[in-house]
Amino acid sequence: MRCVPVFIILLLLASPAASDPLEKRIQSDLIRAALEDADTKNDPRILEDIVSTALATCCKFQFLNFCCNEK
C-alpha cells in the first residue's frame, strides 16, 4: 500500500511536463541562434593581434629579454 504513492510520485517526476508554446518557440530560437553562432568563422588576424599585444606587454614591462629588439 505504501508503494503506490511513491510510484505515482516517481511517475509524475519522470513524465515530461506539457511545455508552453511560447517557451518551446523561444528554446528553438535560442538553439537556432547558437547553431548559427557556432558556424561563424574567426577573423584570421586575431592570432596576429594577440601575439602583437603579448609582445608589446612583454616589452613594456621587460618580462623577458628576448621579446624586444635591443636598439
From Swiss-Prot:
Keyword terms of this UniProt record: Amidation, Disulfide bond, Secreted, Signal, Toxin
Location(s), subcellular: Secreted
Domain notes: The cysteine framework is V (CC-CC).
Family of this protein: Belongs to the conotoxin T superfamily.
Source organism of the structure: Conus caracteristicus
Signal peptide, first to last residue: 1-19
Entry superkingdom: Eukaryota
PTM characteristics: Contains 2 disulfide bonds that can be either 'C1-C3, C2-C4' or 'C1-C4, C2-C3', since these disulfide connectivities have been observed for conotoxins with cysteine framework V (for examples, see AC P0DQQ7 and AC P81755).
GO CC annotations, alphabetized: extracellular region
Chief subcellular location: secreted
Prodomain positions: 20-56
InterPro entries per the UniProt record, alphabetical: T-conotoxin
Listed GO MF terms: toxin activity
Name of the featured protein: Conotoxin Ca5.1
Tissue-by-tissue expression: Expressed by the venom duct.
